[in-house]
Amino acid sequence: MFDNSWEHDTSHLIHIPIERVKAYVLNDFKAANTLELIKAGISLREIEDATNSSIEIKPLPQKLLDKLEQKEMEPRFPFPCEREAQILAYKAWKQNDNKGIFAMATGTGKTVTALNCALKEWQQNNYYKLIIVVPTQALALQWEKEAKAFNFQNIVSTHTEKDWKSILSRYATNSIFNSKKNIVIITTYATFILKHFQSFLYSVKNSEDFIFIADEAHNLGASGPIKKLPIFINNRIGLSATPERIYDEIGSSQLYDFFNSKPPKYTYRFTMKEAIEQGILCHYDYTPVFVELTNIEMSEYRKVTDQLRKFLDPETGKYKPEAEMLLMKRKRIIHKAENKKVAIIRMLDDLTSESKLKYTFVFVPEGYEPDYSVSDSYNIAKEDMHLIDEYSDIFRERRYHYHKFISGLEDAPEILKGFASGDIDVLLSMKCLDEGVDVPRAENAIFLSSTGNPRQFIQRRGRVLRKHQDKEKAHIWDMVVVPPDISENLDNSIEKNLFLGEVKRIINFASLADNRVSIIYSKLNDICMTLGIDLFQILEDEEKQYE
């Protein structure tokens, strides 16, 4: 039959010259899926009918078109196959009564893993109802994009949909008559706790078949969201590279109870070490850059530390809540050490023209930790804005194409696009690159913020470890603050405690770096010996986390 049709010997087939098809596709073809392709084909056939009116071609049965239309609306996995981690996470979630925390390293596909669980449930139930809560507007957009990639329909994002209140109200009313109507709701923690959203949750509280997904789930343990937990929803997924809430045992405990998942293994755990070994994240080199406090800064640090002593609880060994402002003041001394500017100038000036930085994130010290239960964006204080300007000037003076990446930028997508293409060499940011920014092309990171918060530096490291075809490995420089004029004769208890937090961060980075050995047997070891810090015990404790 093929030979006959090729020779134009069949009267019941229409032969459309390939050039006509090519021209049609190039000029007019807008089909986004199979159904539109078929409809486009029908339109093209009708054009041919006009020139071959003697030939009668039966239209496709409406039932078949309806079936195709239904098929095109169904969710599907957007990649050729699932990763082993996604299969194992779903299995563990099912075994834990559809509840759990997925403690997965940044960059290992937490979003896809959670949506895959929802897809699996749809395959069994033939409908889906999701509530996804995220900390920032940027993450809300990212989840919306991923949900569309899975072909989920009826996506309502409270960030992009101005009429979300009435849409959810109508859904709640209609669900009384049709409890299996598909919907994907994406909101931020700040909106989640609002009266309007809580009213919607109350109106659908009998709909136990929702799946509740909390991204960066540690935020759910904050004082606002923890009081609004949707306990009526049985299906729960918490996502976080670092689920534990620092200095908040009560919030952490309530979070673990809600998701029926506890450390260290959680429901499913996928570490950065596993991700690097399996080729999901790229390898990296790590360079600690030691920066001494000035004598004035060290004097101020000692003064604040002395003031803090009266707020130390002797029973728990922790500071009382009244110490918060002093703790912040002391942290800012470390964050904003003046010699960090000297160090980065020296570092940039030592680079040759061939090794000049590109695709580089610079994390500038920030003044405070944002509370995403109050706001879904990070607002920079005037003092902090002055600091990011000072560091920007350093790059400008060395003819780098740089851009400040701060909260509220309307052209943020265009900036990230310019960075990924190489038009922008350096992005300087406070917090805004921590959560919700996915730029695999980034291959360098400079940490100016001496954070002791594991969540922060783990997230930031993950930003530059994503795989990219043009990236062999990542490079990380970390400004490490040390006391001035260290000597063995010094009464160094304060200096020891100052540096101890820095050492823990160094070891966390170094333990997975390709140049691990050279880092440990370097100036780091000398300083630790002087201050009486057991470097190798800290290293051993760090490695136990990956067992």
What are these regions (language model features)?
Residues 96-119:
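Walker A/P-loop
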Residues 62-103:
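Conserved pre-motif I regulatory segment
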Residues 4-74, 234, 307, 467-547:
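Helicase-associated low-complexity regulatory tails and linkers flanking the ATPase motor
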Residues 289, 306-415:
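Conserved helicase/translocase motor-coupling segment
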Residues 189-192, 197-245:
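SF2 helicase catalytic motif II
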Residues 1, 220, 396-516:
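Conserved RecA-like P-loop NTPase helicase motor core
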Residues 222-281:
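Post-DEXD/H (motif II) to motif III coupling segment of the RecA-like Helicase ATP-binding lobe
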Residues 111-116, 126-151, 366-368:
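Conserved Walker A/P-loop ATP-binding site and its immediately adjacent core
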